[in-house]
Amino acid sequence: MPPKGKKNRKNDDWDADLGESIAPVNPAAAAPAAAEAPAAAEKEEEAPVGGLMALMRKNKEKRKKKGLSEDWLDGETPEGQAPAAAPEPDLSAKQAEEANLEDEWALPDKKGKKGGKQQQNKKQQQEEKKKDDEEVPEIRVLTKAEKERLKKEREKQRKKEQAAKKKAAGPAQPQKAEPAKPAEEEKKPEEPAPAPAPAPEPAAGGSKKKIPAHLRLIQKQQEELRRRQEEEQRRLEEERRRIEEEERRAEEERKRKEEEKARKKQKEKEKIEQLKREGKYLTKAQREEKARNQRMLEQMRAAGIKIAALEEKNKEEGAAEGEKEKKEKKKPEKKRRPNKVDEQKALEEAAERARQQAEAAAREAEEKARLEREKAEAEEKAKQAAAEESVDEDWEAAAESDKEDVPDSWDAAASDEEKEEEEEEEEEEEKPAPKKTEKKPEPKTEEKKKAEPKKPEAKKEEVKKPEPKKEEPKKAEANGKPATTTLPTRSKEEEKPKAAEAEKKEVAARPKKPVVNKDNLRSPICCILGHVDTGKTKLLDKIRQTNVQEGEAGGITQQIGATYFPVEAIKQKTAVVNKDGKFEFKVPGLLIIDTPGHESFSNLRSRGSSLCNIAILVVDIMHGLEPQTIESLRLLRERKTPFVVALNKIDRLYGWKKIENNGFRESFALQNKAVQNEFRNRLDQVKLQFAEQGFNSELFYENKNFARYVSLVPTSAHTGEGIPDMLKLIVQLCQERMASSLMYLSELQATVLEVKAIEGFGVTIDVILSNGILREGDRIVLCGLEGPIKTNIRALLTPAPMRELRIKGQYIHHKEVKAAQGVKISAPGLEGAIAGSRLLVVGPDDDEEELEEEVESDLQSLFSRVEKTGKGVSVQASTLGSLEALLDFLKDCKIPVANVGIGPVYKRDVMQCGIMLEKAPDYAVMLCFDVKVDKEAQQYADENGIKIFTADIIYHLFDQFTKHMQEQLEKKKEESKMLAVFPCVLNPVAVFNKTNPIVVGVDVVDGQLKLNTPIAAVKMNPTTGQKEIISLGRVTGIERDHKPLQVCKKGQPAVAIKIEMGGHQPAYGRHLDEKDVLYSHISRASIDVLKQFYRDVVTTDEWQLIIKLKSVFDVQ
């Protein structure tokens, strides 16, 4: 069939078009061939018709017209091109043909010259056919040599293209690339290359063949991919080089460090070898031992103990330090001279001046104390030697010689006190007090050994009290037994020597009286009181340079603590306010007792305030007087204890400029006007609050009358300002106004603060010695859990000066301890000792049994609080004071106590508490404050359901127990829910079901109707005339408008109720009428349950209704 769209075609035979389907080898000649097609068709008509020969001739003529040779290798050169360049365009044209043959689908994108789209498609199809026809025979005729030549040409062309690509500066050739290398085509410009290319001539009327868009896109993508691969390869190469460089550097650094470490190790080894050669090398244990010894040495120095071997060294060091200080003083002066003196520098100068004065005062005090001690030692030795020479062996002679200076009887002495005091003063002038010799234990000499047998007698004379004359013969008899032979019958002759001996003892005791004088004062005991968190312990920490407060549980003091400050330390602290040194210290030191501030520890504050001679009441200047402050004021007023007020936390005043450990007046003068005004305002508020409590108060330096006005000392526990003023004021008041109460008494007074187990000493007791002297070997009696404890003192230990007695540390041993002092006593059998009890010393004439009874009376008063019924909780505490606080709390809560104990909790304590599981399970509880619970005891408690509550802070224990009691209450409430009957009165409206179950509509006339409320009706029996209570059962359902309800109250719309009853239920119409009023069936048990568990829920109107219903149901 002839192709469509061809005009002027006379021969429609399809065979005539066979020649046209064969495309020329050169695609560039396609356009001229297409243009000459009509002319060729006209000549065809004139040619003879001859079948195959005519067809061959026709093809040959066409080739001639196009200027093509029969040989495709030689005839591919287009017209107008040089024949020499024939092979190259021939190859490139062939290559272009091969590229286009693969992509048939892109042909529709090409644009035709003229005509519609269909005509264009037909022409393209014809061209494809021609190409197929031409290529097949041409490819078959290639010889081997031609193929080799073609291959070489292609290789040559490929090399040229690569060389052109490398030349980035020059333009690329416009030759068409092979399909295997589409990316190269993109870079070729349209300009002709030096080599001839098969480009069509514009005169021929044809157009240049374009590369399809999708091929260009693929080429671009391939080029981009190649570029990325190259970049990735370059980046990987750079990364590899960088890693190699880093590894090389790391290796160099490692080697350098190893070399440095080896060098350092070698250097240290050489240093150790050098020290070993010099004999100076110390191991770790030796260094620790040296540091420990140094600390002990410092503590001994702080206590005022001098070591002769170190005195010369200290002098040299002191001289060197003095020179160094002078140089240091000169340096800052030179720097300061040219500068302007501003406020900050004034503060620095004041602080430096205060420090220098304190150091100078401390050195002077130490030197003075040393000279006094040497002088006292020399005098003591001389007196001992004189005393030994003049010792009278005959007691009668001694008694006769002393009789001249003393009154005849104790009664006469008591009646004439003034005369007695004069005699004492005369005796004091004649001979110094022997007590002074007991301040420091001296090394034993031969003379001292001779005087030792007199010690028991001296002790006996100190402890002995004046007694009525009735007991004198008995005591004389008791004391005379070893000296004389006793007869079964008494006679006047026998009584004479006894009376004489009693007289001797009285006279022997008499010379010891001069000890009580104003120059021989004991250390005053000062108690710190105040509200919680006012800074009591922090104030002490600042004075003694410790950190006790932060180590306490919750930062709260819960036990009495004691700290001893020697006079040297007080002098050093007060040097800032005693610059001229005129103030003289007569007391040997100051013992400060720290008491808890919490509400529960009123008993400990009471015990602390009873021990003390003077008190410090700490008040927060920002808050004024608080509840426990007012309670402390009441305690002080009751005991008539003098006190000073520390207005603490002045550093919290806005804008306060601090100077560490300075006097208040100097610091206050440097503050600006606003701070001074604020201080004055707060001071006036505190004064007003004290006036409300009945106390006149004034600033300490403005106070002219200490008897009538309380002194207020502003202090800061953080900066230490005002503390020197406070210490000086306390010592001043003690020496001037309280000398009589600070004189030594022969009677020993001591209180046990705490019982502790100390490694190396066993169980020990902390004791506040407020009067008398304790010695090693003394027989003591104190209160124990299983009765009085009688034992001998094995060791007397005191903490280092200015260290808390409660805190573990290095202890100093003493042969004897003089009041007032906090002392730790080590003795056998102290395991059951009770903290807070009294400690008594058994004298030669004292009866141990009497002392036992006296000591045990403390514990009896405590056990009197224990419930006699045997039902109650068990309480275990660490000290007597804590136990008292717990018992007070439980008494306020109305909780009975069955057992009390002091110390750790063991299995026997838990077993004792387990008895409550049978008697009262709610009280099978142990409250343990600040004690350890044994592992076995805890296990036994868990197995048997006994609750053990432990806490280090007393309020946490209270909270735990309160929570437990609340849980028990809720449990009981749930159990007794069915017994609780809320009162209500119901008026029936309609009966829906008469029985089993009764369903009735009711109005609530009074009270409230709840589910499970028992309902009853009260009727009068017509025959007997008595009340009959008809029980209907319990309300199991309440509905209104078919909606269930839990409760229906008075005044709400009517509801339908269902009443069910197990067994036979009364029926409406037979036992009941619709008009009968219904009531909630109350009883005595239900009323008790309401009172116990629902008292806060039941309203006053409901209680009134219960009273009415009691008469209805005859409840008593």
From Swiss-Prot:
Residues 716-718 are annotated as: G5. Its main location: cytoplasm. Keywords: Coiled coil, Cytoplasm, GTP-binding, Hydrolase, Initiation factor, Magnesium, Metal-binding, Nucleotide-binding, Protein biosynthesis. Residues 594-597 are annotated as: G3. GO terms for molecular function: GTP binding; GTPase activity; metal ion binding; translation initiation factor activity. It is an enzyme of class 3 (hydrolase). Gene3D superfamilies: P-loop containing nucleotide triphosphate hydrolases, Translation factors, Translation initiation factor IF- 2, domain 3. Residues 192-201 have a biased composition (Pro residues). Residues 23-40, 78-89 have a biased composition (Low complexity). It is found in: Cytoplasm. Binds 1 monovalent cation per monomer in the active site, which can be sodium or potassium. This structural cofactor stabilizes the GTP-bound 'on' state, and may also act as a transition state stabilizer of the hydrolysis reaction. Its EC number is 3.6.5.3. Residues 648-651 are annotated as: G4. Belongs to the TRAFAC class translation factor GTPase superfamily. Classic translation factor GTPase family. IF-2 subfamily. This is Eukaryotic translation initiation factor 5B. The lineage of its organism: Eukaryota, Fungi, Dikarya, Ascomycota, Pezizomycotina.
